Amino acid sequence: MQQQSAIVIGAGIVGLAMARALSIKGYTVSVFDKSHAACGASVRNFGMVWPIGQPAGALYNRAIRTRDIWKEIAAESTIWCKQTGSLHVAYNAEEWQVLQELEQQFNTEQRNVLLLNAKKVLSQYPLVNKQNLLGGLFSADELLVDPRQAIELLPEYLTKKYNVQFYWNKCVTQITESIITIGANEQHSANIIVVCSGADFETLYPELFATLPITKCKLQMQRTAAMPTNFTLNTAICGGLSLLHYSSFKDAPSLPLLQKKMQAEYSNYLANGIHVMAAQNNLNEITIGDTHEYGIGFAPFDSMEMNKLVLDYLQLFLPITQQYIAQTWYGIYPKLTNGETELILSPQKNIFIVNGLGGAGMTLSFGLAEEIVATHLP
Protein backbone atom coordinates (compact mmCIF):
# COMPACT_ATOMS: atom_id res chain seq x y z
CA MET A 1 0.00 0.00 0.00
CA GLN A 2 1.38 3.39 -1.00
CA GLN A 3 2.23 5.70 1.90
CA GLN A 4 -0.12 8.65 2.33
CA SER A 5 1.36 12.12 1.83
CA ALA A 6 0.67 15.41 3.57
CA ILE A 7 1.58 19.02 2.87
CA VAL A 8 1.74 21.51 5.73
CA ILE A 9 1.67 25.21 4.86
CA GLY A 10 3.48 27.31 7.46
CA ALA A 11 6.56 26.48 9.54
CA GLY A 12 5.58 28.22 12.75
CA ILE A 13 4.95 26.18 15.86
CA VAL A 14 1.48 25.02 14.76
CA GLY A 15 2.79 23.85 11.39
CA LEU A 16 5.79 22.14 12.97
CA ALA A 17 3.57 20.38 15.48
CA MET A 18 1.26 19.20 12.71
CA ALA A 19 4.26 17.95 10.71
CA ARG A 20 5.42 15.90 13.69
CA ALA A 21 2.00 14.42 14.40
CA LEU A 22 1.35 13.58 10.74
CA SER A 23 4.74 11.89 10.47
CA ILE A 24 4.07 9.75 13.53
CA LYS A 25 0.68 8.83 12.01
CA GLY A 26 2.55 7.50 8.97
CA TYR A 27 2.27 10.32 6.45
CA THR A 28 5.13 11.47 4.26
CA VAL A 29 5.25 15.16 5.14
CA SER A 30 6.41 18.26 3.26
CA VAL A 31 6.32 21.73 4.83
CA PHE A 32 6.15 24.89 2.72
CA ASP A 33 6.83 28.36 4.14
CA LYS A 34 6.76 31.70 2.36
CA SER A 35 9.87 33.02 4.16
CA HIS A 36 13.48 31.91 4.44
CA ALA A 37 12.71 30.75 7.99
CA ALA A 38 9.84 31.09 10.43
CA CYS A 39 9.77 34.76 11.45
CA GLY A 40 6.28 35.34 12.84
CA ALA A 41 4.78 35.04 16.29
CA SER A 42 6.47 31.69 16.94
CA VAL A 43 9.89 33.34 17.27
CA ARG A 44 8.65 36.56 18.89
CA ASN A 45 7.25 35.24 22.16
CA PHE A 46 8.53 34.47 25.66
CA GLY A 47 9.18 30.79 25.02
CA MET A 48 6.91 29.98 27.94
CA VAL A 49 5.16 26.62 27.89
CA TRP A 50 2.46 27.66 30.30
CA PRO A 51 0.06 25.05 31.73
CA ILE A 52 -0.81 27.30 34.67
CA GLY A 53 -2.62 29.63 32.28
CA GLN A 54 -4.93 26.87 31.04
CA PRO A 55 -8.16 25.87 32.80
CA ALA A 56 -8.52 22.39 34.26
CA GLY A 57 -9.58 19.65 31.89
CA ALA A 58 -8.83 19.25 28.21
CA LEU A 59 -6.74 22.42 27.80
CA TYR A 60 -4.60 21.81 30.88
CA ASN A 61 -4.06 18.19 29.82
CA ARG A 62 -3.14 19.37 26.32
CA ALA A 63 -0.63 21.82 27.80
CA ILE A 64 0.98 19.11 29.93
CA ARG A 65 1.20 16.81 26.92
CA THR A 66 2.78 19.61 24.88
CA ARG A 67 5.29 20.30 27.64
CA ASP A 68 6.26 16.64 27.77
CA ILE A 69 6.75 16.57 24.00
CA TRP A 70 9.03 19.61 24.26
CA LYS A 71 11.09 17.69 26.82
CA GLU A 72 11.27 14.64 24.56
CA ILE A 73 12.41 16.75 21.61
CA ALA A 74 15.01 18.60 23.69
CA ALA A 75 16.41 15.28 24.93
CA GLU A 76 16.87 14.17 21.32
CA SER A 77 18.29 17.43 19.95
CA THR A 78 20.31 20.50 20.88
CA ILE A 79 17.17 22.53 21.62
CA TRP A 80 17.40 24.10 25.07
CA CYS A 81 14.53 23.74 27.48
CA LYS A 82 14.24 23.95 31.24
CA GLN A 83 11.32 23.15 33.49
CA THR A 84 11.71 26.20 35.70
CA GLY A 85 8.14 26.37 36.91
CA SER A 86 6.55 29.78 37.43
CA LEU A 87 6.12 32.26 40.27
CA HIS A 88 3.27 34.74 40.64
CA VAL A 89 4.17 37.33 43.27
CA ALA A 90 1.85 39.41 45.47
CA TYR A 91 2.49 42.94 46.72
CA ASN A 92 -0.92 43.86 48.08
CA ALA A 93 -3.65 42.18 50.11
CA GLU A 94 -5.91 41.61 47.11
CA GLU A 95 -3.20 39.84 45.11
CA TRP A 96 -2.23 37.73 48.11
CA GLN A 97 -5.85 36.73 48.72
CA VAL A 98 -6.25 35.63 45.11
CA LEU A 99 -3.05 33.58 45.29
CA GLN A 100 -4.28 31.83 48.43
CA GLU A 101 -7.55 31.00 46.72
CA LEU A 102 -5.76 29.75 43.63
CA GLU A 103 -3.56 27.49 45.73
CA GLN A 104 -6.68 25.81 47.12
CA GLN A 105 -8.26 25.53 43.68
CA PHE A 106 -5.14 24.18 42.01
CA ASN A 107 -4.49 21.66 44.78
CA THR A 108 -8.05 20.40 44.29
CA GLU A 109 -7.24 20.08 40.58
CA GLN A 110 -4.09 18.15 41.55
CA ARG A 111 -1.71 20.69 40.10
CA ASN A 112 1.78 20.90 41.54
CA VAL A 113 1.63 24.29 43.28
CA LEU A 114 3.00 25.71 46.51
CA LEU A 115 2.14 28.93 48.34
CA LEU A 116 5.28 30.68 49.59
CA ASN A 117 5.47 33.43 52.18
CA ALA A 118 7.75 36.40 51.53
CA LYS A 119 10.69 34.86 53.38
CA LYS A 120 10.54 31.67 51.33
CA VAL A 121 10.18 33.59 48.06
CA LEU A 122 13.28 35.63 48.83
CA SER A 123 15.30 32.62 49.95
CA GLN A 124 14.64 30.82 46.66
CA TYR A 125 14.42 33.85 44.33
CA PRO A 126 16.64 36.53 45.86
CA LEU A 127 16.29 38.93 42.91
CA VAL A 128 12.61 39.46 43.70
CA ASN A 129 11.95 42.89 45.22
CA LYS A 130 11.43 42.44 48.95
CA GLN A 131 9.72 45.79 49.57
CA ASN A 132 6.01 45.16 50.31
CA LEU A 133 6.31 41.53 49.18
CA LEU A 134 3.63 39.35 50.78
CA GLY A 135 4.43 36.07 49.08
CA GLY A 136 4.05 34.10 45.88
CA LEU A 137 2.44 31.09 44.27
CA PHE A 138 4.92 28.66 42.72
CA SER A 139 3.84 26.16 40.09
CA ALA A 140 6.20 23.39 39.00
CA ASP A 141 4.52 22.71 35.64
CA GLU A 142 5.95 25.45 33.45
CA LEU A 143 8.81 25.06 31.01
CA LEU A 144 10.94 27.54 29.09
CA VAL A 145 12.49 27.33 25.65
CA ASP A 146 14.20 30.05 23.65
CA PRO A 147 11.66 30.42 20.84
CA ARG A 148 14.23 31.73 18.39
CA GLN A 149 16.50 28.74 18.88
CA ALA A 150 13.72 26.19 19.19
CA ILE A 151 11.83 27.21 16.04
CA GLU A 152 15.09 27.44 14.09
CA LEU A 153 16.22 23.94 15.11
CA LEU A 154 12.90 22.08 15.00
CA PRO A 155 12.92 21.68 11.19
CA GLU A 156 16.34 20.02 11.34
CA TYR A 157 15.09 17.73 14.10
CA LEU A 158 11.94 16.80 12.17
CA THR A 159 13.94 16.10 9.02
CA LYS A 160 16.45 13.94 10.86
CA LYS A 161 13.92 11.93 12.89
CA TYR A 162 10.89 11.78 10.59
CA ASN A 163 12.30 12.70 7.16
CA VAL A 164 10.05 15.77 6.95
CA GLN A 165 11.02 17.85 3.92
CA PHE A 166 11.08 21.64 4.17
CA TYR A 167 10.67 24.08 1.28
CA TRP A 168 11.54 27.68 2.15
CA ASN A 169 10.72 30.88 0.27
CA LYS A 170 7.71 29.12 -1.23
CA CYS A 171 4.54 31.19 -0.96
CA VAL A 172 1.50 29.02 -1.59
CA THR A 173 -1.14 31.21 -3.23
CA GLN A 174 -3.78 28.68 -4.24
CA ILE A 175 -5.11 25.29 -3.19
CA THR A 176 -7.30 23.32 -5.58
CA GLU A 177 -8.42 19.89 -4.43
CA SER A 178 -5.16 18.11 -3.55
CA ILE A 179 -2.81 20.53 -5.34
CA ILE A 180 -0.99 23.60 -4.06
CA THR A 181 0.26 26.30 -6.42
CA ILE A 182 3.34 28.47 -5.90
CA GLY A 183 3.92 31.38 -8.25
CA ALA A 184 2.83 30.98 -11.86
CA ASN A 185 3.13 27.26 -12.39
CA GLU A 186 4.93 25.40 -9.58
CA GLN A 187 2.60 22.76 -8.18
CA HIS A 188 2.74 20.00 -5.58
CA SER A 189 0.13 17.48 -4.54
CA ALA A 190 -0.65 15.43 -1.44
CA ASN A 191 -3.44 13.36 0.05
CA ILE A 192 -3.83 15.80 2.94
CA ILE A 193 -3.14 19.55 3.05
CA VAL A 194 -3.01 21.43 6.36
CA VAL A 195 -2.96 25.24 6.36
CA CYS A 196 -1.20 26.71 9.42
CA SER A 197 -0.88 30.30 8.27
CA GLY A 198 -1.01 32.07 11.62
CA ALA A 199 -1.88 35.75 11.33
CA ASP A 200 -1.82 35.66 7.52
CA PHE A 201 -5.54 35.58 6.76
CA GLU A 202 -5.05 37.28 3.40
CA THR A 203 -3.14 34.79 1.23
CA LEU A 204 -5.17 31.58 1.48
CA TYR A 205 -8.95 31.46 1.95
CA PRO A 206 -9.30 35.22 2.57
CA GLU A 207 -13.05 35.14 1.88
CA LEU A 208 -13.47 32.42 4.49
CA PHE A 209 -11.34 34.17 7.10
CA ALA A 210 -13.36 37.35 6.56
CA THR A 211 -16.45 35.51 7.81
CA LEU A 212 -14.84 33.90 10.86
CA PRO A 213 -14.85 35.13 14.48
CA ILE A 214 -11.13 35.78 14.38
CA THR A 215 -8.96 38.86 14.76
CA LYS A 216 -5.30 39.63 15.39
CA CYS A 217 -3.36 40.69 18.46
CA LYS A 218 -0.23 42.83 18.38
CA LEU A 219 2.03 42.56 21.40
CA GLN A 220 5.18 44.52 22.22
CA MET A 221 8.14 42.67 23.69
CA GLN A 222 11.57 43.52 25.08
CA ARG A 223 14.71 41.54 25.81
CA THR A 224 17.76 42.35 27.89
CA ALA A 225 21.33 41.73 26.94
CA ALA A 226 22.95 38.73 28.63
CA MET A 227 22.77 39.46 32.34
CA PRO A 228 25.66 38.85 34.76
CA THR A 229 26.02 35.26 35.90
CA ASN A 230 24.76 36.14 39.37
CA PHE A 231 21.57 37.67 37.90
CA THR A 232 19.52 34.50 37.62
CA LEU A 233 15.75 34.41 37.99
CA ASN A 234 15.53 30.60 38.42
CA THR A 235 11.89 30.65 37.30
CA ALA A 236 9.45 32.59 35.12
CA ILE A 237 8.07 35.47 37.19
CA CYS A 238 4.76 37.35 36.88
CA GLY A 239 3.19 40.28 38.68
CA GLY A 240 -0.35 40.86 39.87
CA LEU A 241 -1.67 42.08 36.51
CA SER A 242 -1.17 38.57 35.12
CA LEU A 243 -3.80 37.29 37.54
CA LEU A 244 -6.37 39.16 35.45
CA HIS A 245 -5.17 37.73 32.15
CA TYR A 246 -5.51 33.94 32.22
CA SER A 247 -8.77 32.01 32.20
CA SER A 248 -7.42 29.52 34.74
CA PHE A 249 -7.55 32.27 37.39
CA LYS A 250 -11.07 33.51 36.71
CA ASP A 251 -12.81 31.41 39.38
CA ALA A 252 -10.86 32.88 42.31
CA PRO A 253 -13.63 34.42 44.47
CA SER A 254 -11.62 37.57 45.21
CA LEU A 255 -10.63 38.26 41.62
CA PRO A 256 -13.34 40.96 41.17
CA LEU A 257 -11.84 42.86 44.13
CA LEU A 258 -8.41 42.71 42.54
CA GLN A 259 -9.89 43.79 39.21
CA LYS A 260 -11.47 46.81 40.91
CA LYS A 261 -8.18 47.75 42.59
CA MET A 262 -6.22 47.40 39.36
CA GLN A 263 -8.79 49.45 37.48
CA ALA A 264 -8.39 52.23 40.03
CA GLU A 265 -4.58 52.14 40.14
CA TYR A 266 -3.53 50.82 36.70
CA SER A 267 -6.33 51.80 34.32
CA ASN A 268 -3.82 52.71 31.60
CA TYR A 269 -2.35 49.22 31.84
CA LEU A 270 -5.70 47.50 31.55
CA ALA A 271 -6.74 49.74 28.66
CA ASN A 272 -3.66 48.63 26.73
CA GLY A 273 -3.92 44.97 27.67
CA ILE A 274 -0.69 45.06 29.66
CA HIS A 275 0.39 42.40 32.08
CA VAL A 276 4.01 41.85 32.96
CA MET A 277 6.12 38.69 32.91
CA ALA A 278 9.80 37.85 32.67
CA ALA A 279 11.53 34.70 31.41
CA GLN A 280 15.28 34.02 31.21
CA ASN A 281 16.89 31.85 28.55
CA ASN A 282 20.09 29.79 28.51
CA LEU A 283 22.08 32.84 27.37
CA ASN A 284 20.97 34.71 30.51
CA GLU A 285 18.87 37.09 28.41
CA ILE A 286 15.52 38.04 29.95
CA THR A 287 12.45 38.43 27.75
CA ILE A 288 9.89 40.89 29.10
CA GLY A 289 6.35 41.77 28.07
CA ASP A 290 3.76 42.45 27.10
CA THR A 291 1.00 44.61 25.63
CA HIS A 292 -2.12 43.47 23.76
CA GLU A 293 -3.73 45.48 20.95
CA TYR A 294 -6.53 43.88 18.91
CA GLY A 295 -7.56 44.50 15.32
CA ILE A 296 -7.03 43.35 11.74
CA GLY A 297 -4.35 45.95 10.91
CA PHE A 298 -1.70 47.69 13.00
CA ALA A 299 0.79 50.52 12.70
CA PRO A 300 4.28 49.08 12.10
CA PHE A 301 5.75 51.08 14.97
CA ASP A 302 6.46 50.30 18.60
CA SER A 303 5.26 52.65 21.30
CA MET A 304 8.06 53.54 23.69
CA GLU A 305 5.40 54.72 26.12
CA MET A 306 3.97 51.19 26.25
CA ASN A 307 7.43 49.68 26.70
CA LYS A 308 8.09 52.11 29.55
CA LEU A 309 4.83 51.14 31.24
CA VAL A 310 5.88 47.50 31.11
CA LEU A 311 9.31 48.23 32.57
CA ASP A 312 7.89 50.50 35.26
CA TYR A 313 5.57 47.76 36.43
CA LEU A 314 8.31 45.14 36.19
CA GLN A 315 10.39 47.11 38.66
CA LEU A 316 7.75 46.51 41.31
CA PHE A 317 9.06 42.95 41.50
CA LEU A 318 12.37 42.73 39.59
CA PRO A 319 15.35 45.14 39.37
CA ILE A 320 15.44 45.44 35.58
CA THR A 321 15.62 48.94 34.14
CA GLN A 322 15.87 50.46 30.66
CA GLN A 323 19.67 50.32 30.70
CA TYR A 324 19.57 46.53 30.38
CA ILE A 325 17.28 46.43 27.33
CA ALA A 326 19.02 45.30 24.14
CA GLN A 327 16.07 44.61 21.83
CA THR A 328 12.44 45.56 21.34
CA TRP A 329 10.00 44.17 18.79
CA TYR A 330 6.38 43.29 18.23
CA GLY A 331 4.58 40.12 17.26
CA ILE A 332 1.14 39.47 15.82
CA TYR A 333 -0.90 36.36 16.47
CA PRO A 334 -4.45 35.26 15.56
CA LYS A 335 -7.10 35.37 18.27
CA LEU A 336 -10.63 33.97 18.18
CA THR A 337 -13.34 36.36 19.32
CA ASN A 338 -15.99 33.79 20.25
CA GLY A 339 -14.24 32.36 23.30
CA GLU A 340 -12.99 29.24 21.51
CA THR A 341 -9.36 28.16 21.93
CA GLU A 342 -8.60 26.83 18.45
CA LEU A 343 -9.96 26.92 14.92
CA ILE A 344 -10.13 23.64 13.00
CA LEU A 345 -11.91 23.82 9.64
CA SER A 346 -12.08 21.75 6.49
CA PRO A 347 -13.00 24.11 3.62
CA GLN A 348 -12.57 21.33 1.07
CA LYS A 349 -12.24 17.57 1.27
CA ASN A 350 -8.89 16.57 2.83
CA ILE A 351 -7.88 20.21 3.31
CA PHE A 352 -7.71 21.49 6.87
CA ILE A 353 -7.11 24.87 8.49
CA VAL A 354 -5.58 24.91 11.98
CA ASN A 355 -5.36 28.36 13.54
CA GLY A 356 -6.52 30.65 16.31
CA LEU A 357 -4.56 29.37 19.31
CA GLY A 358 -4.55 32.90 20.66
CA GLY A 359 -1.01 33.31 21.93
CA ALA A 360 -0.81 29.80 23.42
CA GLY A 361 0.90 28.15 20.48
CA MET A 362 4.03 27.15 22.37
CA THR A 363 1.85 25.78 25.17
CA LEU A 364 -0.76 23.84 23.19
CA SER A 365 0.40 23.07 19.64
CA PHE A 366 2.06 19.68 20.05
CA GLY A 367 -0.80 18.26 22.06
CA LEU A 368 -3.45 19.76 19.78
CA ALA A 369 -1.73 18.38 16.68
CA GLU A 370 -1.83 14.86 18.08
CA GLU A 371 -5.54 15.25 18.84
CA ILE A 372 -6.31 16.56 15.35
CA VAL A 373 -4.47 13.73 13.64
CA ALA A 374 -6.25 11.19 15.85
CA THR A 375 -9.76 12.59 15.40
CA HIS A 376 -10.03 14.69 12.23
CA LEU A 377 -7.82 13.07 9.59
CA PRO A 378 -8.32 9.85 7.63
Model-derived regions, located:
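Beta1/beta-strand and adjacent pyrophosphate-binding region of the FAD-binding site
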Residues: 1-14, 30
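Gly/Ala-rich phosphate-binding loop of Rossmann-like dinucleotide-binding domains
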Residues: 19, 23
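Glycine-rich FAD pyrophosphate-binding loop
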Residues: 24-43
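Dinucleotide-binding Rossmann-like beta1-alpha1 core, especially the glycine-rich loop
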Residues: 46-124
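C-terminal catalytic lobe of FAD-dependent flavoproteins
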Residues: 273, 281-287, 293-378
